[in-house]
Amino acid sequence: MSNHSAIETISTAEISPIKRASTLSANPELIYAAGAWAVSGVITLLWPNTQEFERTTDLAVLQWIFAALLLVVHVFRGQLAGLFRKLHYNAWRLVALAVLLSIWQVASAKLGLWPQPYFPPPQGVLDAYIKDYVRLADSIRASLILLFFGVGLGALAGFLTGLSTGWSPRVGYWTIPFLRLFGPVPATALIPIVLFVFPTSFSGGAFLVALATWFPVAVLTWSGVSSVDSSYYDVARTLGAKERFLLLKVAIPATLPHLFVGLFMALGGAISVLVVAEMLGVKAGLGFYLDWAQGWAAYGHLYGALIVMAVLFSGVTTLLFFVRDRVLVGQSGGVQW
């Protein structure tokens, strides 16, 4: 074999995905994560509880199953390369999660440091999921319907408001003072009026969510239209473009990055308004579920709903950024998630 062929073979081996996976598998972080979850399961089952808690054995079994799955992924890392890379990258986070779960377990169920029933152990949350999954699933469905309906209306209204404000000085003459005066008013401040004016709690909640979405989307869209370089319009006009073309092909595409920033900012406010509206007036959804759980001192259900909300709304935000990355292909920078 010539020197050139040998160098080419070595270079190919260095960039081979199989070689990279083998090098990566030399690090035992995933084994550490599996061990942490296995030990956490031992603590859950073998350390006596200060009182009787249902689902203790079930929780320990689930922890051991998860530990076994981590080991399976590590052993079959060649066949599960994509999953292995993701879990390997998050291995220390999984270790930290197992440690936090054990601390929660010990402080609440094993030593009784946290008063019951206000701070139930993890198996209390698991018991709530198993016993009340139907009500919880209905609450998730109701919250998502209200959220997407309200955010959709608010985003459309905000986009049209911001676009017309930035594009037309005549429109901006009237809308800018309105935005500056009423936009910063919290949507939750209008709950007493909304619950009286609107015929149903759903329509009132949708209006509040839409209102919380409208202001940031309108302001960011207005900013995006106003910040478009005038030279873009000049070049298009030189080529014979009409006002309609300038709006649809120049102004709106240039505004899209600002629009998605506005949607990101609006989503957080819309979620907050959604939960408050459900707790105070809307007779369905996760906010209503939280209020119900607190009223009946079902704190396992309450913490379970909080965990679901964290995962669910984080997923909704991730979906927004997934759409943004598909729409704004090739554009780097901006808000990261």
Regions found by a protein language model. Give the residues of each.
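Transmembrane alpha-helical segments of polytopic membrane transport and secretion proteins
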Residues: 1-95, 321-337
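Periplasmic/extracellular loop-to-transmembrane helix junction in inner-membrane transport proteins
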Residues: 49-58, 78, 82, 86, ...
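Transmembrane-helix boundary motif in ABC transporter permease subunits
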Residues: 76-83, 149-179
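Hydrophobic alpha-helical transmembrane segments of multipass integral membrane proteins
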Residues: 100, 137, 141, 145-165, ...
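Short cytoplasmic-facing helical segments at TM-TM junctions of multi-pass membrane proteins
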Residues: 173-177, 217-262, 286, 290
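Generic hydrophobic transmembrane alpha-helix motif, especially the helices
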Residues: 179-216, 223-224
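Transmembrane alpha-helices
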Residues: 207-211, 244-277, 304, 309, ...
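C-terminal transmembrane helix and the adjacent membrane-cytosol boundary/short C-terminal tail
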Residues: 226, 257, 261, 303-337
